[in-house]
Structures are given as structure tokens and as C-alpha cells.
Design a protein with these regions (language model features):
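Glycan-processing catalytic domains of CAZymes
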Residues: 1-196
Length: 196
């Protein structure tokens, strides 16, 4: 009715979170992709693309193969509709499952670039965009990580989007809404980096 586009998020079996192995997601989604396209994608002009919902942060067992297989199946069945992923950056605020506020073994900008260069190299032909979640790094790290993200996306002909998290990871209560000043800092950093 309003000319908006809908991106369908693939099924998350939860097995990856328990095993660290993304190959399960490929098997479970083979049927989901076919069914969704048959019942919705082929019938509605608002169906704009696919969200490959396996969220990773680093070089993960089976991730390149899984993202490639899922992206290819989505594109093949839908005549090339766009696909995107939304990983997180393994920064010091990536502390799920712990009572700590930060962690010591956060990824460096250089290691992040190395790992995501390898991942993008293996998926860029079937994944059109990457929207890194921005909540796991500190505000003074935004420019460094965002500029690397944009550089890599440009290198591989992908779009670089932001996933501006609207909840606050700086609080011991998970998760309060973020103050607008903090959200604005993240959006302005994405703009400075030239995100699409």
C-alpha cells in the first residue's frame, strides 16, 4: 500500500548458538526459503529481499559456506533479490552470558579487518549488503571500525548499512533504551564513514 519493501529474515534454529557450527542453519532453511518464496515472495511486490539471520562476529566454523549457500538459494529462487547479513563486532561490550560490563579479549580493528576481508571474499557474490550491529564497541571506537567496514564493503561491491542498536549496553540492566545523544553519535559515525 505504501510502497515499502519487506526483507524476510531466515529461520534461526538455535543450534548454531549451542554448537558454534552454522551448517545446521543451511539444512533447516532450505525448506523455509522455498516455502516463503512460494507463499509470499512470488505473490507480493513488497517482498524486497532476504535477511540471512545467522549472526556472527568473527571467523566462525562454517560461516562462509553457510552464508554462501543461503544467499545463493535466496537469490536463485527470487530472481536475484538482494540479501543482507547483520553481524556484530566482537568488541568489549560483547558480554552475553556474563555479569561483566566489558571483556578484556575484544577484537582489534586489524583482526576485525582481516577476518571480515576473508568472509566478504567468500560471500560477496551472493550477499549484497552488510549491516554491522554497532552496540558491542565503545563510542570512541566507532570511526575506526566503521571506516574498515565501509572499506571492505566497497572492496567487494557490497553495500554497507548500519544497524544502530537503540538499547544501552552500558547499563547493568539489560537492556534499557539508549539516550538519543548516544544514538546520534552512532548515526553520525556511520555518516562520517560514508555508509550507504
Amino acid at each position: 500500500k505504501y510502497g515499502m519493501k519487506f526483507y524476510f529474515g531466515l529461520y534461526d534454529s538455535g543450534k548454531y548458538w549451542d554448537t558454534g557450527d552454522m551448517t545446521w542453519e543451511v539444512e533447516d532453511n532450505k525448506y523455509v526459503i522455498d516455502e516463503v518464496w512460494e507463499n509470499y515472495g512470488s505473490k507480493y511486490k513488497s517482498f524486497g529481499g532476504w535477511y540471512i539471520s545467522g549472526e556472527i562476529s568473527r571467523a566462525t566454523k562454517g560461516a562462509i559456506g553457510a552464508f554462501h549457500a543461503l544467499g545463493k538459494q535466496c537469490k536463485d529462487i527470487s530472481n536475484g533479490l538482494p540479501t543482507f547479513i547483520s553481524p556484530w563486532i566482537d568488541g568489549k561490550k560483547a558480554i552475553m552470558g556474563t555479569t561483566k560490563m566489558t571483556k578484556e579479549d575484544a577484537v582489534s580493528v586489524q583482526q576485525h579487518e582481516k577476518e571480515w576481508d576473508e568472509i566478504f571474499d567468500g560471500i560477496h557474490d551472493v550477499v549484497d549488503a552488510c549491516a554491522f550491529q554497532d552496540g558491542h564497541i565503545d563510542y570512541d571506537e566507532l570511526d575506526a571500525f566503521f571506516s574498515v567496514n565501509k572499506k571492505l564493503a566497497d572492496k567487494y561491491g557490497m553495500q554497507c548499512w548500519t544497524n544502530a542498536e537503540s538499547f544501552d549496553r552500558d547499563m547493568p540492566i539489560r537492556f534499557l533504551p539508549i539516550k538519543f545523544d548516544k544514538l546520534r553519535m552512532k548515526l553520525e559515525a556511520a555518516k562520517r564513514a560514508g555508509y550507504d
